[in-house]
């Protein structure tokens, strides 16, 4: 009789573990799917911005991997900073694409995305004070529009992360998550530095 009870308890635990694991895997897949949409929109922003670079900067951007940038050819420090930000954001998106639940990868995406927004804000201010800049109307408007299209996607990603993180930290699924090394995911910061 006790063997039957023990077997029943083991069976319940086994089926619970399989169900909990499947739920966690589905939630992880949901986070990855939502990040794919965010990634696609951020890539649109990158491609659009790279396509609107002055020709001399576009040529340098394509040669960045082969040699150091000739700083003398750049108009100002802000242009050099933009090329670095674009390269960093592209690299961080590449990493996050392969590890959409990695907190470190998402922190880097957040950092680089916000650095791009800060660059745009500095360029708009520079244009308003009469400093030379190629980032003039209608470019800031279009940049803001592309960024705004990413916000609902980032909200959907953050909601998926919240569901996943709740499941990973909720007892008793948290014990299973620790066993299979499912860590909480990082949310995207959807603060707007241009507001």
Describe each model-derived feature in a short phrase.
Residues 2-195:
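A helix-centric hydrophobic-segment signal that preferentially recognizes long
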């Amino acid at each position: 009789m006790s063997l039957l009870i023990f077997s029943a308890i083991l069976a319940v635990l086994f089926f619970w573990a399989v169900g909990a694991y499947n739920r966690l895997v589905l939630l992880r897949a949901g986070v990855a799917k939502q990040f794919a949409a965010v990634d696609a929109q951020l890539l649109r922003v990158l491609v659009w911005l790279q396509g609107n670079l002055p020709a001399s900067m576009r040529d340098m951007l394509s040669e960045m991997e082969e040699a150091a940038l000739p700083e003398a050819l750049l108009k100002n420090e802000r242009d050099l900073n933009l090329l670095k930000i674009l390269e960093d954001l592209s690299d961080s998106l590449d990493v996050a694409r392969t590890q959409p639940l990695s907190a470190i990868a998402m922190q880097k995406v957040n950092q680089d995305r916000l650095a791009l927004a800060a660059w745009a804000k500095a360029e708009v201010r520079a244009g308003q004070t009469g400093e030379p800049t190629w980032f003039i109307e209608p470019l800031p408007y279009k940049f803001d529009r592309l960024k705004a299209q990413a916000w609902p996607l980032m909200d959907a990603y953050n909601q998926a992360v919240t569901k996943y993180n709740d499941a990973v930290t909720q007892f008793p699924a948290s014990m299973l998550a620790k066993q299979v090394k499912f860590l909480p995911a990082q949310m995207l910061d959807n603060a707007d530095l241009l507001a």
